[in-house]
């Protein structure tokens, strides 16, 4: 009879060890991702025009030959994780291993329309990622956010006081907006009949510009912190307004909240939604709040999608925010005085929620 410990077979214990080690060293995944972005490897392969060998990559990077083996190790590991494809190519009667871009690494090609490299650079900067070393201290602080514990101030105050990281953050949000905009191009129903819209927390206007291009007769106001919009110039149907969404929101037929409410507590979200309700038109279907957020559904979503949503929920908890289930969204809408809502799928893990006053 096989021995057991705590009622578990050795094979089960070793599986547990493998899982434990996988997560102990999971930070290396993020650092290898940062490595390929910092070295512009996706751009190098893209510009190469075909799969690249390690020797070619080492030559372009101009790293010491003594590190060629390490480059190969990291490339092999990132290929295993889906960031590159390992292929065999024929060169001068010799077959060599080479690396090609995948759908994931194509999103890291700087200068392309859809590029998430700024998101990698912002999130994996020690300013943000280093804060997670304070999780234990944070969990015992009644009111402070994780970033409040780590940075010494509220995250939004920190951005105001640190222009360099503020730019990195805005660039990251703009890059993420491009992904959402890809989905919005095929999701016209939410904006039909709307003549004016306020993009609350709209940053530098990346999403608003796509909306204006798609609906040229729609007037769009980008509403954000004064320091974000103070030097930005509008167009005929796009304008910028600085202010505080907790005080008031500019009037329009509709209000857009894209990845805003997950930053805030339920009480803060109610306050934001109440101000948005005051701002939108009372004219039938035209007046509404359009929310782009995650909706957690552990029973229906695929395992990987659920994992992404739950990971983001932990991430947002560090701002005292959260990702929400449909029941949690519904509760917020009712408490903020809205009469109805509709949820439509938008991307793999985001939904478009229309909320009616």
Swiss-Prot record:
Binding site for S-adenosyl-L-methionine: 200-203, 224-225, 244-245, 258
UniProt GO molecular function: isoflavone 7-O-methyltransferase activity; protein dimerization activity
Catalytic function, reaction form: a 7-hydroxyisoflavone + S-adenosyl-L-methionine = a 7-methoxyisoflavone + S-adenosyl-L-homocysteine + H(+)
Keywords tagged on the record: Methyltransferase, S-adenosyl-L-methionine, Transferase
EC number in record: 2.1.1.150
SUPFAM superfamilies: S-adenosyl-L-methionine-dependent methyltransferases, Winged helix' DNA-binding domain
GO biological process entries: isoflavonoid biosynthetic process; methylation
PROSITE patterns in alphabetical order: SAM_OMT_II
Family: Belongs to the class I-like SAM-binding methyltransferase superfamily. Cation-independent O-methyltransferase family. COMT subfamily.
Function: 7-O-methyltransferase involved in the biosynthesis of isoformononetin. Can use daidzein as substrate, but not medicarpin or 2,7,4'-trihydroxyisoflavanone.
Organism: Glycyrrhiza echinata
UniProt-recorded name of the protein: Isoflavone 7-O-methyltransferase
Pfam families: Dimerisation (PF08100), Methyltransf_2 (PF00891)
Entry annotation: catalytic residues: 262
Stored InterPro entries: COMT-like (IPR016461), O_MeTrfase_dom (IPR001077), Plant_O-MeTrfase_dimerisation (IPR012967), SAM-dependent_MTases_sf (IPR029063), WH-like_DNA-bd_sf (IPR036388), WH_DNA-bd_sf (IPR036390)
């Amino acid at each position: 009879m096989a021995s057991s410990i705590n009622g578990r077979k050795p094979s089960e214990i070793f599986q547990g060890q493998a899982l434990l080690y996988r997560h102990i060293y999971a930070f290396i995944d993020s650092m290898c991702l940062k490595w390929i972005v910092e070295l512009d490897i996706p751009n190098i392969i893209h510009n190469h025009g075909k799969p690249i060998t390690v020797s070619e990559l080492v030559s372009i990077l101009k790293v010491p030959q003594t590190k060629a083996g390490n480059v190969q190790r990291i490339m092999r590991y990132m290929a295993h994780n889906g960031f590159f494809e390992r292929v065999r190519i024929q060169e001068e009667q010799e077959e060599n291993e080479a690396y090609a871009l995948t759908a994931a690494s194509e999103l890291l090609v700087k200068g392309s329309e859809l590029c998430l490299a700024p998101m990698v650079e912002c999130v994996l900067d020690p300013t943000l990622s280093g804060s997670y070393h304070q999780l234990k201290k944070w969990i015992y602080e009644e009111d402070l956010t994780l970033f409040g514990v780590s940075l010494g101030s509220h995250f939004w105050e920190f951005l105001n006081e640190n222009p360099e990281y503020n730019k990195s953050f805005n660039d990251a949000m703009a890059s993420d907006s491009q992904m959402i905009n890809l989905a919005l191009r095929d999701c016209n129903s939410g904006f039909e009949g709307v003549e004016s819209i306020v993009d609350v927390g709209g940053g530098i206007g990346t999403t608003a510009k796509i909306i204006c291009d798609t609906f040229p007769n729609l007037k769009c106001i980008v509403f954000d912190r004064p320091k974000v919009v103070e030097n930005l110039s509008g167009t005929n149907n796009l304008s910028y307004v600085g202010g505080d969404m907790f005080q008031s929101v500019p009037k329009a037929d509709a209000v857009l909240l894209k990845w805003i409410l997950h930053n805030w507590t339920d009480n803060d979200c109610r306050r934001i939604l109440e101000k948005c309700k005051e701002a939108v038109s009372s004219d039938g279907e035209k007046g509404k709040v359009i929310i782009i957020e995650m909706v957690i559904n552990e029973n229906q979503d695929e395992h990987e999608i659920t994992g992404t949503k739950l990971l983001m929920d932990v991430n947002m908890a560090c701002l005292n925010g959260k990702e929400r289930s449909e029941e949690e969204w519904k509760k917020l809408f009712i408490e903020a005085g809205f009469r109805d809502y509709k949820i439509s799928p938008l991307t793999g893990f985001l939904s478009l929620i229309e909320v009616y006053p």
